[in-house]
Amino acid sequence: MRHVQEARAVPAEHEARPAPVTMPANGSPYRLGAALLQSLAQEMNALAEQASALLSMPPESLSLDADAFAQIARRNVPRWHFAMLNDTERNTALMTALERGIPAGATVLDIGSGSGLLAMAAARAGAGRVFTCEMNPLLAEIARNVISAHGMSDVITVIGKPSTALDPVRDLGGPVDVLVSEIVDCGLIGEGLLPSVRHAREHLLKPDGIMLPSAARLHGRLVSSDEVLKLNQVTTAGGFDVSLMNTVATRGHFPVRLDTWPHRFLSEAAPLVEFDLARSALEPGERPLALTATADGEVQALAVWFELDMGSGITLSNPPDNPRSHWMQGWVPLDKPVPVKAGETLALRLGWSDFTLRVSI
């Protein structure tokens, strides 16, 4: 049985939090916060210096091989773009979905241009006009060049803005017929799928418009892995207590390729939540879960993966047994491990914000 999203506010007592850390007598959470801001300022200053070095170069000597350009590009464009573009299973599914789902002559908005791949696929599928938006200026310019090299600039327009900043009339000439929004991470929502679709559905898509994907589901299993736990938690090292590092541990879900780490599943796979992208509110919320343990053990997290409904019977998913997918699985940690016995039902609460999954007892 599938569970449709119940959108309601998340009570504070159900928010997942890392284990409390004892501050030393000469320490202060305010000093940690100030140090965090200082770290951000230093990173921004370093980027500004590299950008200034690029801008000071004569245009004729500016090269893509320049060290300053390479440094900025490394920080600015995540490496997963390459794995994604080389994911044949993903590409084939999306191309087929666009070919079957886009009516001839339709106006299409693609959220998140990247290299321009999906915008070009939409044009090839028969769209009359394609708009694609990209908030990263470097990627937007790459997409423009790739699209131009394929002779599609007369059909495709790249807009250097996030979708939430688009003006439906000024930028798009009116609401579009089809919305393409494959902006998902290992846990579905980490790239802002929910707020982006929520906004686009209300402001950028015609009332009877087509959404690709039209629905998204999360599946999951109870899981235990001391090795994965160590990726985001520490107590001692070399005989010293370094647990204060846990203040910078990831809160909520993070990516793990489960088949590369020793782990034990402690339940069968189960549907966790479904988002009807065309009709559901898509607001932050939570829902109860009841998962039955299949073995004795200590539950440390929920392992989660998504399933996108692309229409025409086409789905896109990243389960643990699919090594072909470039997407990893999501690891949603519990605050504390919970011992279970085989046959015991564990009651949990799954919560989601616009960007993060959390689970609590």
Swiss-Prot record:
Similarity comment text for this entry: Belongs to the class I-like SAM-binding methyltransferase superfamily. Protein arginine N-methyltransferase family.
Species in which this protein is naturally found: Streptomyces achromogenes subsp. streptozoticus
Top-level EC class as recorded in UniProt: transferase
Protein name: Arginine N(omega)-methyltransferase
Stored Pfam families: PrmA, PRMT_C
Cross-referenced SUPFAM superfamilies: S-adenosyl-L-methionine-dependent methyltransferases
EC number(s) recorded for this UniProt protein: 2.1.1.381
Gene3D superfamilies hit by this protein: Hnrnp arginine n-methyltransferase1 (2.70.160.11), Vaccinia Virus protein VP39 (3.40.50.150)
CDD domains registered for this protein in UniProt: AdoMet_MTases
Annotated Basic and acidic residues bias: 1-17
GO biological process, one term: methylation
Reactions mediated catalytically: L-arginine + S-adenosyl-L-methionine = N(omega)-methyl-L-arginine + S-adenosyl-L-homocysteine + H(+)
Gene: sznE
Knockout-associated phenotype: Deletion of the gene abolishes SZN production.
